[in-house]
Amino acid sequence: MSWQSYVDDHLMCDVEGNHLTAAAILGQDGSVWAQSAKFPQLKPQEIDGIKKDFEEPGFLAPTGLFLGGEKYMVIQGEQGAVIRGKKGPGGVTIKKTNQALVFGFYDEPMTGGQCNLVVERLGDYLIESEL
């Protein structure tokens, strides 16, 4: 299965009639393995901030999480495994695997819980597959 099919079939899937607004799988170096059409262009310093927060949980909390130049308020995640951000009626979930970062962006009517489920389910599968 190609990385693009993971994005198309497993991240951009239908969840109770809703879909993520954007999704991607990136290498931990920030290289894009696959992405949806509306996934924002991330800056190197934004990837560095994400990596730093996974190493030092809470690093992004004072300044916020920036993705594609947009600021997200960091909300409770899972130390070293998941970063969650909120911006208005939407947000983002980022799941770290052994080799990758799985991103999912959502907006109403999709909920943060639905986004978490989709992103973390694929992330857990990749971890089990040692990816």
UniProtKB/Swiss-Prot annotation:
Induction: Down-regulated by light. It is found in: Cytoplasm, Cytoskeleton; Cytoplasm. Expressed at low levels roots, leaves, stems, flowers and siliques. Expressed in leaf epidermal cells, trichomes and stem epidermal cells. Detected in phloem exudates (at protein level). The keyword Cytoplasm applies. GO terms for biological process: actin polymerization or depolymerization; defense response; inflorescence development; lateral root development; leaf development; unidimensional cell growth. The keyword Cytoplasm applies. PROSITE patterns: PROFILIN. It comes from the Eukaryota. GO terms for cellular component: cytoplasm; cytosol; mitochondrion; nucleolus; nucleus; phragmoplast; plasma membrane; plasmodesma. Signal peptide: none annotated. Keywords: Actin-binding, Allergen, Cytoplasm, Cytoskeleton, Plant defense. Binds to actin monomers and regulates the organization of the actin cytoskeleton. At high concentrations, profilin prevents the polymerization of actin, whereas it enhances it at low concentrations. At low concentrations, associates with the poly-proline motif of formins to enhance actin filament elongation rate. Binds ACT1, ACT7 and ACT11 and inhibits actin polymerization. Coordinates the stochastic dynamic properties of actin filaments by modulating formin-mediated actin nucleation and assembly during axial cell expansion. Binds G-actin and poly-L-proline in vitro. This is Profilin-1. It comes from Arabidopsis thaliana.
